Amino acid sequence: MDLQRHPIPFAWLDRDKVERLTDFLSNLERLDNVDLREHPHVTNSCVVREGDDVDDLKTLYNLLVLWLMYHYVLSKRKPDYNAIWQDITKLQSVVNEYLNSKGLNKGIFENMFTNKEKFESQFSDINRALLRLGNFIKWGSNVAIDTPYVNLTAEDSSEIENNLQDAEKNMLWYTVYNINDPWDENGYLITSINKLIYLGKLFLALTQSWSKLEKVAMSQIVITQNHLSGHLRRHDNFNIVYSHRVLQTPLTGQRVESFLKIITSDYDIIKSSLESHSASKAFSMSEIGPNSLMDFVPLRGDIHSNLTLPSMSIDTKKSSLDPARLKKSNSRSLDSFLRMQRQPKFLELDSVDNAGEKILLKEATLGGENVKATTPASSVSLMSGVESPSSFTSTNLDLPLSSFTSTNLDLRDKSHGNYKIGPSGILDFNVKFPPNAQLNTNGVDLLQDKTSIGSPSSGITDVVNGFANLNLHQNKSNVSPPWSRNTAANADFLDPVHRFVPEQTGTPFVLNNSDVAGSEAKHTTYSTETGVSPRNVFLIKDLRGKDGFRKQKQSDIPKSLTKERNDKAIMHSREVTGDSGDATETVGARNSPALRKIKQANDFFAGLNKKNDRDVLRGGKGNSKDLHSGGNAKKKEMSGKFNDDKEMTRNGQEPSRSLMGDARNAGDEQYIQAGLGQRVNNLLSQFTNLISLGEKGIEDILQNQRGTELKLATENKSGRESEEANVEKILEVSNPQDMFKNFRLQNDLDSVQSPFRLPDADLSRELDSASFKDALDLKLPGNGEREIDLALEKVKVGETETSDLKVGQDESFVPAQLMKVETPEEKDDIIEQMVLRIRQDGETDENTVSGPGVAESLDIEAKGESAIAS
């Protein structure tokens, strides 16, 4: 961009000021120092005046344009430093050749020149190593000499340092100092080392100084942008809203040029919006002397929170001019609020007038004058003296960058009437607060700022947040109603519906009780000692006296919830088991749905277990225990269990849960929901009687394994040895429990289903046809008895094949011979003959019906799909 041909979008400035700014930007690289902060006349040219007043908004806009143009020129005219880097790599290769010739190069020195970033970070080590190497080559000693270069005169060293300083001040236009050795005093190698040291320092000075100025420019752009956009917030005018959105565009170093083009294209809109906003903003000006007190409306407690407080202003007029002060101010320029080295200053208070709600300021440095003023604390902005981004995070002023927007202070240099602007182009607010100042706000909410036209985080909020060391005494006017506080005791208790109600001081409580709710409307007098109504105090004491009311600590609330559930379970179990404990502590326990389900399940199992007189799994003769114990025994067991749980609960322990009990209850609930009823009881009892027919034979086999001889009835006496061998094969299993691991019932009868799948049982048909009055009274339909008789006769005569058992698909069957025997011994003999016959044959006929029996109980494999039903 040709700055002479393309006008810069400055506004409201005189022609001479615009020319001054344009010349500075056009000839930036020709200046001795390109730092904009070192040219105060340039930043002062951005000031816009309306008569004797300075327009803050328009001045900020021109400063923003100035910093944008400065960043643009700084980036466009940055020279290429790669030429210097190429010279550095060439000289480094010369040094490497010497080190290789001496066998001293281990690769460490060469790796430091691999890239620019690594070179910059390790240059201090490189410089020290080069000096030691040059001194060793020149003087033959490894002792480092405290000189910046090897065997150079002090004059040459001074000229080199001046050259480096000039390059640091103006990195856009620099000259390379020529280090030569016309009389060959040092030699080519020493001269190369000196050049390498100098070029390394020059490269770092150029790159680091440019990066520093670029960061300063970006920081000033962002801060000024936030100030300017803060002025334009909360307006309904389209131009102002549009300008506010444009100024809120997030910026980076790469986007500055595009943002500058946007401002140039929308110059008319932004200018008109700023003009309309400036016209609506009124500045209060008072003509006072330099040492007069400035009186303001005091901040009282009865002022509404949205009251517009007056802004502080200082008159620029002065009765007499101080030439010394004027000269000092012009030479010193005005500090910017982003000065990197300076720290924020605060108001020094001479005294605090609490009666008049005023603060007497002592030596408030405003525009170079030491004045005193009385001002409300809320009308003083803490943006004073902030000069660097590092100061934003100061412990005395913890404010974000966006919070530094427009200020309420209209400050000017009183010595000569100029707007006090530092080299950075930002106002200098040298207002100081002492750390021991105290302020009485009388309960007024200082966080509601209506006077500042800054960013959302500016204004009184920033003032209050900035008082890091101030004592703010606020009146406690917002006091909760006395009934909502309870200071009677420092304990917690539980209300009737298990809601924890804290009793600690100052903590409100709620009693979820109808009587208590009614008492709130009736009683309006409260206890002066506890802050609770007399009626509620009486109810609290009454609730504490109840057995169910337990005092708890606040930290034990999670544990108490678990204990409460255990207590409920114990109370419910007492009603179910008939225990002597009082089960009426829980309201509505007898009518709960869970209690009814438990009672129905217990009644169901009690009736079911009365009909079971043998344990199928254990198989012992005369054993009266089955899969589920009897009803009375179960009640005793449950009663004892819950008594133990009660003791454990009282001792603070968690009662152990019964997995079998949980599983049984879950199954009972499924049975009850399926509506099986009494038919399931009958079905289970009949099934148990059916499968217990073969227990006698199984018991004899087990007794033989313990030493009792197994006597098998056979007509072939000569085959005694083979019979004993077969018995030994039968008894190969050493563990009796392993004999029954594959025990199962297999049949195709629809009327008799396995009890382990009762929820899926098909009860669509009438069960009377398949029910059993007694296990020994069952008869097979048709000619079933005749077929079994023929099969047994074949066994007796020693036939090798068994007869087919044609069994109906819808009826259960039992061998008829087992029902006709008169004594148990005869029945055992018949079963033993069938077992022996199965083992001797090895396999059965393929047409026999597979079903559960003794052979399967002994884990005897039946080949194919045939088996003998027992």
UniProtKB/Swiss-Prot annotation:
Domain of life: Viruses
An example molecular function term from Gene Ontology annotations: structural molecule activity
InterPro entries xrefs: Herpes_UL11/UL32 (IPR010340)
Post-translational modification, as annotated: Phosphorylated at multiple sites.
Gene Ontology cellular component list: viral tegument
Main location: virion
Family matches, as Pfam families: Herpes_UL32 (PF06070)
Basic and acidic residues composition-biased segments: 612-649
Region Disordered: start-end pairs: 612-662, 840-870
Keywords recorded for this protein, A-Z: Phosphoprotein, Virion, Virion tegument
Subcellular location: Virion tegument
Annotated family: Belongs to the herpesviridae large structural phosphoprotein family.
This protein's name: Large structural phosphoprotein
Native species: Human herpesvirus 6A (strain Uganda-1102) (HHV-6 variant A)
Lineage, broadest ranks: Viruses, Duplodnaviria, Heunggongvirae, Peploviricota, Herviviricetes
